[in-house]
Regions:
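Non-catalytic beta/alpha edge segments that cap or flank active sites
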Residues: 4-195
Length: 195
């Protein structure tokens, strides 16, 4: 049995009802949030999705160290992703907006440019989950990648879709981030990557 993200398996065995567990505290995961919106960056539209991400992830114990609204300019988005990963050393960057078919939707391109490794399963899981709700989910070009030791995840632009996509992946992300950061081993086998 694996109790991901809230407990670590120290050795194999069985857990029965009534057994006690030793809880080992872990540090909060640090996140950056980038909203990609031409209108939002000019103050012509209120950002609702960035604050929605913040509310959801803070309830899950994340610490938000940066939250910005930028234009859909690919270069600016890329630079902020790199800054958050390389200078702020956040565990995860969540972006919202700029993942559709519009000529100004540049978030996936900026994300792929920032990548040192691909992590497509996260974006695929969000699309799969969202397709159960709307066929328009197939129009998402969202990407999910790794930059060194930071995960970067593109989310849709609407608060409703942000909530749905985070529901699909958030429980598993913390485990993946801890493996990426070499703070945890594979789930269920009691190993640690740090020796």
């Amino acid at each position: 049995m694996c109790i991901r993200d809230s407990a670590r398996v120290l050795h194999g065995g069985r857990i029965d009802v009534g057994d006690s567990l030793k809880l080992i505290s872990t540090r909060k995961l640090r996140a950056g949030i980038i909203t990609a919106s031409d209108k939002g960056s000019k103050g012509e539209r209120e950002d609702e999705s960035g604050p929605a991400i913040r509310r959801i992830i803070e309830k899950q114990g994340y610490e938000v160290v940066s939250q910005v609204v930028l234009s859909d300019d690919a270069e600016g988005l890329y630079r902020e992703m790199v800054r958050l990963a390389d200078e702020e050393d956040v565990d995860v960057v969540f972006t919202t907006g700029g993942t559709g078919f519009s000529p100004r939707d540049n978030t996936p391109e900026a994300t792929m440019r920032a990548a040192t490794r691909n992590a497509p399963g996260i974006a695929e899981a969000m699309r799969y989950y969202s397709l159960q709700i709307t066929p328009r989910a197939m129009l998402s070009r969202a990407a999910s990648v790794i930059r060194n030791r930071t995960l970067i995840v593109n989310l849709p632009g609407s608060p409703k879709a942000v909530k749905e996509c985070l529901e699909a992946v958030l429980d598993t992300l913390a485990h993946g981030i801890r493996i990426l950061r070499e703070e945890d081993g594979e789930c269920g086998n009691g190993t640690s990557l740090k020796k």
